[in-house]
């Protein structure tokens, strides 16, 4: 599924920044799509020769050593939701707990809300959510297990204190 280009598109013109920006784009895309799928679509779209293993090495490697081409980076950007045109003009902010694939967010976004925090533990729901919704890396936090941000996951905290 192709999307509008992501905000970093203009930065890819600076070849010196390109490897790190492409790496960042790959990291974002890999939270949405399986590496096997990304390798397949990059190969189909750009005539690349990526495999799941070779993309995994790129993900784990140093950003400045990223070997994906600018063309690959631009295609990956097209798979990531872009910033809505009215993003800065939102009327209120909200959090999306137990988010699923974003049904509640759909309604809140429609009436002018800006999501600042999302929590979803299911891997597949989380990937679908990220594929459907723009998440600003500076304003939005994506969390998997709600217990990671509450007191209930801390062994030194009693049940009475946690609840």
Predicted segments with their positions:
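Conserved active-site and SAM-binding loop architecture
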Residues: 2-163
